[in-house]
């Protein structure tokens, strides 16, 4: 039984014994209420009984919870003739019992929800609890394997590029050597063609001189022949008749003169030939020296150019390798940043979801704490009302021997089991 006590019996403060209780008591599910037969047949209160016959303790107003704080009179069941309470009061008591049972049931359900939420909070707050994340390890392994293959392929491509560049350098060397040899051959052929021209000119000069010598020899023979003919003709004309001796200069020996002329021309020809050979040898030696010096300079320039080309190609290959390595490292850094940003975003989403869940749990806990406080306050008021009603019943029971009337005794004996049953039920619920 429970109701809000009167201002004299129960204040608005919570019950003193409720401060030591942290959780609400459970009401057993086997609690039963009084049957309707007890309320109708055994606790009948006569409606014709006036208020003047009631004692002063029964006329004090008690404020019931189910009656919207409307005061009602609790009669003395030992003094009444047919029962302790009237029908309205019994209905109010039954309503209070139902309400107390519903409050206790609600307290039990809230405690279960509180325990479940505490378990969830404990599971969320455990240090070894790892967040559930999707397993991307096999994808990471595949990506790492593909990255290794890509790096190996890039290294192989770099090695092949170096080999191709080396082959190009060797081909350039052979091409430069071929070009140098070709230029030397062209120079030699040009020199040979020039010398052949000079040789042709000298041959022409020689043939001209030989033709001139032959013509001179023919002239000499003609002169000799003419002279002999003239001599013979004169001898035939003169015969032996005249022996003329002329005191003239001795005659010139034409053969000797011709021999001298021949020797002179031969000496001139030999001198010219020797001078031409010396000039040709000097020119050839000078050209050979110039060719050798030019070839040495050309070879040095070509060697220096090849060295510079080789150095430039080596530096270009190193630059390409460094650029490839830089690009691969930049790609690796970008992939790593993307991977860690994805993981960070996943972790942040997980943290946000957990924080949202914790905020919801805190809100639920605060709401349940408020409801729990309200229920504790209600329980304290109900216990205060129960104690008030128990005190009133005990007072009425203590007055029972002093009240006269056999009808009251019969009514007391008829209603006592009902009130005792209700008190026991409430005590079992609040134990």
Swiss-Prot record:
Family: Belongs to the intermediate filament family.
Region (Coil 2): 253-396
Site (Stutter) location in chain: 338
Ranges for region Head: 1-89
Subunit structure: Heterotetramer of two type I and two type II keratins.
Protein name, UniProt field: Keratin, type I cytoskeletal 40
Task performed by this protein: May play a role in late hair differentiation.
Every IF rod domain range: 89-400
InterPro entries in the cross-refs: IF_conserved, IF_rod_dom, Keratin_I
Name of encoding gene: Krt40
Signal peptide: none
The keyword RNA-binding is annotated on this UniProt entry: no
UniProt source species: Rattus norvegicus
Superkingdom of the organism of origin: Eukaryota
Keywords attached to this entry: Coiled coil, Intermediate filament, Keratin
Region (Linker 1): 125-135
Gene Ontology MF terms in the entry: structural molecule activity
